[in-house]
Design a protein with these regions (language model features):
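Core nucleotide-handling region used for phosphoryl-transfer chemistry
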Residues: 45-84, 89-94, 98-415
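Intrinsically disordered, compositionally biased, charge-dense segments
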Residues: 1-47
Length: 415
């Protein structure tokens, strides 16, 4: 079990007093954290951290040419052994939060319940959890058999999630539920489950398959939270922290085989970045954007790119001003953006050339990962592929998500 820690921006583990006690993976049990009074061994201390992981191509919006170069190098290095830094991005649902408050009471809820105003969304019993869901929308969901079944499923797993936590643990885990009951085994001898958009198959005669067989419910955890909802990185060993077999907290599932990188595509991308770097950085210069009162320009570019998932990702940038006219961006800011782009046409054209090229290289890599024979297979409506992958990087993790397939299917779901 891990000691009480926080994780600094330099990835150094610190104790409650702020004293450095090592880096992840190098904790020495003989080194006791210094504290003014005895502290709970399982208590998790948080430092506010940025939760969003950027798509490989979107890094350019915030980091300019340096971000483009980082994305390029990250993708190229996957062929050179860095594929071991890539893990499956699980598509779970619903998003849940579970843990214990300062009084030691166990709570299981969802994101809305955790921050609820006007009602107590931090359910402390199976019955309270089911009623919380059924009472939403004025109780209309009580007449929907599917929703009633969902509420009962949540009720039935409450005790399992309570019992999987050490009794002295204080804090919360945020994650996505993968299944309520042990998944069935299909004709190909794979466990099969579909928590949301993606259907997953896990080879039964694998280590993960053995863990699934022993479990009742499965979850993938992403972050830890404190009572105020402040998020931080996971600071416990997921393989040893949780108790019993009923709840399987899925460990990071690493990609097993390196992709073959298209050197011609990489070379073209490198040349495009080099040719446009000065103009690109001028277009995205934060000081300039602040002066023009359009510091949120990168967020607007991100929103536009996301919208193109619905209409097609070809010719990115060509219909930006048509899109922005129908957006929530004010008329005054729209005019400023137009004038700024007209003054930086080379950077504007280069931006979308780079974004499209990164996306193309990324999608080719994703397709290779999806086609490899692996213990975990994923598909959407019968077509190979899932939510994608996450590439660990010291300057910020990178999402490798197939926007044209998963993102489009996910955005089309009515919730």
């Amino acid at each position: 079990m891990q000691p009480p820690v926080s994780i600094g921006n330099d990835f150094t583990i610190r104790d409650k007093t702020g004293q450095d006690i090592g880096i992840p993976g190098q904790w020495d049990p003989s080194m006791k954290p210094k504290a003014a009074k005895p502290v709970n061994e399982s208590k998790v201390y948080l430092k506010e951290a940025e939760a969003r992981i950027q798509h490989a191509e979107d890094i350019v919006f915030w980091e300019g040419s340096k971000g483009a170069a980082r994305a390029l190098e990250s993708l190229r290095n996957l062929e050179k052994g860095k594929h071991t830094d890539v893990t499956i991005k699980w598509d779970g649902s619903p998003a849940i939060i579970f843990g214990r408050n300062e009084e030691g009471e166990f709570i299981l809820t969802d994101k809305s319940g955790f921050v609820a105003v006007g009602y107590d969304g931090k359910a402390k019993s199976p019955e309270a959890l089911a009623n919380m869901f059924l009472n939403r929308s004025g109780g209309k969901n009580r007449s929907k058999p599917g929703y009633v079944a969902f509420a009962n499923n949540m009720k039935n797993v409450f005790n399992a999630y309570r019992d999987c936590l050490p009794e002295d643990f204080e804090g919360y885990f945020k994650g996505d539920l993968l299944y309520f009951n042990t998944p069935p085994v299909n004709e190909q001898n794979y466990f099969e489950f579909k928590p949301n958009i993606v259907t997953y198959e896990v080879k039964k005669d694998s280590e993960l398959g053995t863990d699934i067989q022993a479990s009742t419910t499965g979850v993938v955890v992403h972050r830890i939270l404190n009572e105020k909802g402040t998020e931080g990185p996971i600071s416990v060993d997921l393989n040893s922290f949780f108790q019993g077999d009923d709840v399987l907290v899925f460990p990071p599932q690493t990609v097993e085989k390196a992709p073959v990188i298209n050197n011609e595509s990489i070379s073209r991308l490198k040349q495009t970045i080099s040719k446009n770097s000065v103009a690109l950085d001028k277009l995205l210069d934060e000081t300039t954007l602040v002066g023009l009162k359009m510091k949120d320009f990168p967020k607007i570019l991100y929103a536009y790119t996301n919208s193109k998932v619905d209409t097609g990702l070809d010719s990115l940038g060509s219909d930006f001003f048509e899109w922005i006219r129908n957006s929530k961006v004010s008329g005054v800011k729209q005019k400023k953006i137009l004038e700024h782009v007209q003054s930086n046409t080379t950077g504007w054209t280069g931006l979308w050339d780079i974004v499209s090229s990164i996306m193309s290289v990324k999608d080719d890599i994703i397709n290779q990962f999806d086609s490899h024979d692996a213990i975990v297979r994923s598909s959407i409506d019968g077509q190979s592929g899932g939510e994608g992958y996450v590439l660990a990087h010291p300057e910020g993790d990178i999402k490798l998500v197939p926007r044209a397939t998963f993102s489009k299917a996910n955005r089309a779901v009515k919730r």
